[in-house]
């Protein structure tokens, strides 16, 4: 099968609206948590989120196009534009039918639904906006990215809740592996910090109860109390190796493994024994034809909920046995919160940057873990070369996905 490499990256995040800005913030241990400003939270238990700051859609697309998109699509189009530019990809020189798109969103636009539902109740059904459905549905992220950049190849929208970003990149990887595309623009996007979004997750008792930005999202810490909602987008350019070499592209890393499974257990809780998540990891490692002992770093799903962090720890132990003690594990959600459908994508680009620079970021805010959480969750950052990075995503409904990226080497 074809080899697949990463040649471009773009990001809109709570700690930076470009890959470079995001990465500098990661290395500085910057957190993106603050009081929600999109609406009045006086009646809400949760008052913190990781909002994108200073985003102006008109800086990335013309105003007319921006008005026809909800924010989750604007984030994706902006991040995709950066990724394509970063890759040096000239679409006028490409066969557009060989360039595809796999950009997912876990929810789509809650903003559009809330806005038009209010209009329905106040003014009646005849006043609901005719563009409600195409503005709201999650596949419009892939649709708008394809339209904006003339991508006429395979276009898909994966919706697997919090595993969406990882599944999107994984399915793009498979598409190129199988020879169905030369290039795929892939990733995830989300914008769900809305009244119903926060109320819904709060009703699940999934959100952090902390009002301290420094202690609200603390994966693997004994005092963790829930996730913190984030928003944004991360998009990558994946490319068939020979195609990338022929056009002289810079190669960041190589995607070498992808594994999935289903817990088939519960609609919100991961399986207690971690067997499903473990299988996704072992499938990704087997796909790369390497040994479990070759894995020395995992970017965990690490949501800062009691169950996820405990059960993911069990999954890592199940997948790697005694070797789990030798693996460095961190959670990017300690800085950006949970980006839902974009989470796996932002964590993937984090892995690529870490491989590129030989740097593993710390899990910000981690102080002390309970007894069963006895692995190395990176209280401190690490500097030094390593070859593989494994990124995990676990979604509501029992969706487990792991993707494995390798430091690029010729041969």
Question: Where are the model-predicted features located?
Answer:
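ACP-dependent fatty acid/polyketide chain-elongation machinery
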Residues: 1-65, 242-254, 349-363, 406-411
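Condensing-enzyme catalytic core mediating Claisen C-C bond formation in acyl metabolism
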Residues: 3-7, 34, 212-288, 297, ...
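Short, well-ordered amphipathic alpha-helical segments that serve as non-catalytic structural scaffolds
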Residues: 76-87, 141, 168, 239-241, ...
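Conserved beta-ketoacyl condensing-enzyme motif
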Residues: 6, 23, 27-160, 189-198, ...
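Active-site-adjacent elements of ketosynthase-type condensing enzymes
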Residues: 42-51, 108-112, 191-217, 259-279, ...
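Cysteine-centered functional microenvironments
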Residues: 59-69, 99, 103, 123-135, ...
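Active-site-proximal alpha-helical scaffold in enzymes
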Residues: 76-89, 138-142, 146-190, 228-249, ...
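Glycine-/small-residue-rich "gating" segment that lines the acyl/pantetheine channel
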Residues: 122-129, 170, 174, 190-246, ...
């Amino acid at each position: 099968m074809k080899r697949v490499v990463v040649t471009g990256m773009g990001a809109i995040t709570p700690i930076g609206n470009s890959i470079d800005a995001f990465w500098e913030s990661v290395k500085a241990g910057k957190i993106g948590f603050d009081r929600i400003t999109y609406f009045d939270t006086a009646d809400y238990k949760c008052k913190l989120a990781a909002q994108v700051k200073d985003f102006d859609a008109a800086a990335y697309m013309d105003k007319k196009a921006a008005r026809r998109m909800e924010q989750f699509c604007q984030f994706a189009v902006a991040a995709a534009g950066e990724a394509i530019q970063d890759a040096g990809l000239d679409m006028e020189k490409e066969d557009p039918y060989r360039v595809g798109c796999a950009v997912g969103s876990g929810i789509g636009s809650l903003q559009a639904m809330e806005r038009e539902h209010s209009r329905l109740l106040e003014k009646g059904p005849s006043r609901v906006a005719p563009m409600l459905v195409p503005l709201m549905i999650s596949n419009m992220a892939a649709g708008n990215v394809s339209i904006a950049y003339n991508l006429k190849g395979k276009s898909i929208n994966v919706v697997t809740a919090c595993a969406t970003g990882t599944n999107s990149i994984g399915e793009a990887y498979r598409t190129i592996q199988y020879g169905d595309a030369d290039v795929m623009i892939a990733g995830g996007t989300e914008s769900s910090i809305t009244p119903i979004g926060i109320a819904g997750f709060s009703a699940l008792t999934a959100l952090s109860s902390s009002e301290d930005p420094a202690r609200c999202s603390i994966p693997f810490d004994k005092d963790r109390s829930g996730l913190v909602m984030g928003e944004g987008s991360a998009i990558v350019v994946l490319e068939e190796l020979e195609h990338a070499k022929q056009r002289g592209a810079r190669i960041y890393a190589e995607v070498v493994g992808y594994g999935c499974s289903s817990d088939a257990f519960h609609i919100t809780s991961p399986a207690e024994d971690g067997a499903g998540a473990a299988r996704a990891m072992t499938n990704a490692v087997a796909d790369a034809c390497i040994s479990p002992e070759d894995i020395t770093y995992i970017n965990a799903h690490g949501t800062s909920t009691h169950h996820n962090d405990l059960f993911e720890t069990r999954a890592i132990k199940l997948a790697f046995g005694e070797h789990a003690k030798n693996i460095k594990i961190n959670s990017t959600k300690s800085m950006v919160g949970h980006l839902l459908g974009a989470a796996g994508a932002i964590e993937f680009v984090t892995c690529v940057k870490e491989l590129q620079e030989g740097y593993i970021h710390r899990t910000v805010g981690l102080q002390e873990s309970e007894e069963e959480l006895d692995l190395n969750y990176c209280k401190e950052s690490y500097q030094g070369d390593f070859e593989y990075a494994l990124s995990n995503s676990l979604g509501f409904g029992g969706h487990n996905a792991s993707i494995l990226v390798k430091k690029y080497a010729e041969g």
